[in-house]
Amino acid sequence: MAAAPRRGAGGERRSGRDDRRGGSADKGVSYIERVVKINRVAKVVKGGRRFSFTALVVVGDGNGMVGVGYGKAKEVPAAIAKGVEEAKKNFFRVPRIGGTIVHQVQGEDAAGVVLLRPAAPGTGVIAGGPVRAVLECAGIHDVLTKSLGSSNPINIVRATVAALKSLSRPEEIAARRGLPLEDVVPAPMLRARAEAKAGV
């Protein structure tokens, strides 16, 4: 009788890792996955040092949904898989207009500060690695950013998430100000939004 393949041995597991790097399918939905940081952790025990790995992962659908997860395991693939699952549990929706954010916003976490500003279509994502990972997974294609304070990827990612969670929808801003939507959102952004809805 043939022995069952060991967990973590090549073949199918290697293929799974490749799928995670480029995006995976979950119940018919294709997700974008970005590994922001992998860190090796050493724990001192009686017999010596025991190593494990942590993975900071961002997952999104590229259409306004994004989440961040942190996984820990004895092997890198397992740590990434745990991070992906946690990120999916932490999904939240990001208000967008076209391919950019609705208004300027700032997020903070510990000593990390991230400033996000709307940008015109064609600008691209002007951001460093950790911030870029979150924005691209959320489906934001045009934005200006600035990171201040801590350069720790965990703080930067959490600050970016805090900024995105504090965004308001265009309709909410217009209602608070008692103005029509056209007076709150610049015309190019409204056109980009209409084109995105029409699939242009």
UniProtKB/Swiss-Prot annotation:
- Kindly list the biological process annotations in GO that this record carries: translation
Q: Looking at the record, which segments are called Disordered?
A: 1-25
Q: Does the keyword DNA damage apply?
A: no
Note the Gene3D superfamilies from the entry: 3.30.160.20, 3.30.230.10
Q: Look up keyword rRNA-binding and say if it applies.
A: yes
Q: Which stretches make up the S5 DRBM domain?
A: 31-94
Assembly and partners are described as:
Part of the 30S ribosomal subunit. Contacts proteins S4 and S8.
Family according to the record: Belongs to the universal ribosomal protein uS5 family.
Kindly provide the name given to this protein in its UniProt entry: Small ribosomal subunit protein uS5
Gene name of this polypeptide: rpsE
